[in-house]
Amino acid sequence: MSDAAVDTSSEITTKDLKEKKEVVEEAENGRDAPANGNAQNEENGEQEADNEVDEEEEEGGEEEEEEEEGDGEEEDGDEDEEAEAPTGKRVAEDDEDDDVETKKQKKTDEDD
């Protein structure tokens, strides 16, 4: 059993050394390590960055298409309801506070 543990730790160390070596090589070549911390070759890093940009553009494009395809009234109606809901709750909370203050004032007035 102890042999397996030693083998596993040596594999991790080798992997770490390879990653550090790649990072050092990239730094020497004037390239920074990828932001995600994974040392990758230049081609893979560029492909991943391009894919992330494409996904963001696609997501933004889909939202615009949905707005154009659907009736604006339905979507706007939902948004208005959501916007009004928190405001209504705040008003209700304020009313409760006012009631408490009014009761306190009445008690004070009665005592005088």
Swiss-Prot record:
Sequence positions bearing Phosphoserine: 2, 9-10
Mod. after translation: Covalently linked to a small RNA of about 20 nucleotides.
Cross-link (Glycyl lysine isopeptide (Lys-Gly) (interchain with G-Cter in SUMO2)): 103
Entry's transmembrane regions: none
Compositional bias segments (type: Basic and acidic residues): 13-31, 101-112
Keyword annotations of the record: Acetylation, Isopeptide bond, Nucleus, Phosphoprotein, Ubl conjugation
A GO BP entry: positive regulation of transcription by RNA polymerase II
Compartments (UniProt record): Nucleus
The keyword Isomerase appears for this protein: no
Domain of life: Eukaryota
Database matches in Pfam families: Prothymosin
N-acetylmethionine: residues bearing it: 1
Region annotated Disordered, chain positions: 1-112
Modified residues (Phosphothreonine): 8, 13-14, 102, 108
Modified residues (N-acetylserine): 2
GO-annotated molecular function: DNA-binding transcription factor binding; histone binding; histone chaperone activity
GO CC annotation terms, alphabetical: nucleus
Record field: compositional bias (Acidic residues): 43-84
Main subcellular location: nucleus
Annotated positions of the N6-succinyllysine modification: 15
Subunit record text: Interacts with NUPR1; regulates apoptotic process.
Function: Prothymosin alpha may mediate immune function by conferring resistance to certain opportunistic infections.
Family membership: Belongs to the pro/parathymosin family.
PANTHER family for this protein: PROTHYMOSIN ALPHA
Protein name: Prothymosin alpha
Gene: Ptma
